[in-house]
Amino acid sequence: MKTCITKGIVTVSLTAILLSCSSTWAAGKGGVGLAATRLVYSEGEEQISLGVRNTSPDVPYLIQSWVMTPDNKKSADFIITPPLFVLNPANENLLRIMYIGAPLAKDRETLFFTSVRAVPSTTKREEGNTLKIATQSVIKLFWRPKGLAYPLGEAPAKLRCTSSADMVTVSNPTPYFITLTDLKIGGKLVKNQMISPFDKYQFSLPKGAKNSSVTYRTINDYGAETPQLNCKS
């Protein structure tokens, strides 16, 4: 399930609602969708691409894109082309993303975010009294160095869990960012969580938990859930 943060934006002739959320290719009956829920930029690649589709039959959208750091600042280490363009009804386009920054960590992934804002056009007739919805889709972008000891597919099984009193600690000894989903502690579902490389996260023991056993799934490079695993100590 995706979570959206809603902000009100007021302009001279238009009141819009900006929705910031993760996006999938599907955009309902009309709107803008992305072809992926996450991106992986492998070291050595000249560029990667992201598809953007306008499923509306009659509304053009102004598309603006950029890359952000985890602290929500625009990154100057990436170029996206085209950075600004009009996406006509029932059309799609490719965003090309190129890394131009300094060398990054060689022993682990580095996290960025790709942001795509879609603003629907307004006709002269509509100006001043029309509510328009502008969507801002934000997806994770992982920069992945060459030569990591094992592929991402082997990483989920390497997580380790320890418990003490009313806390459970999940440790990630791998060089990958691992997103836990369908996460259960003592049989009780808890909030999804992403754990950074070589880091750990502490969970409070849920109310009614039978024990401190942990089961989980993770998200692969294609945005799909992996099979359920039991966390080892």
Swiss-Prot record:
The keyword Iron does not apply. It holds the Pfam family PapD_C. SUPFAM superfamilies: PapD-like (SSF49354), Periplasmic chaperone C-domain (SSF49584). Its main location: periplasm. GO terms for cellular component: outer membrane-bounded periplasmic space. Belongs to the periplasmic pilus chaperone family. PANTHER family: FIMBRIAL CHAPERONE PROTEIN ELFD-RELATED, PILUS ASSEMBLY CHAPERONE. Part of the elfADCG fimbrial operon, which could be required for adherence to host epithelial cells. Could be required for the biogenesis of the ElfA fimbriae. This is Probable fimbrial chaperone protein ElfD. It comes from Escherichia coli O157:H7. The lineage of its organism: Bacteria, Pseudomonadati, Pseudomonadota, Gammaproteobacteria, Enterobacterales. The gene is elfD.
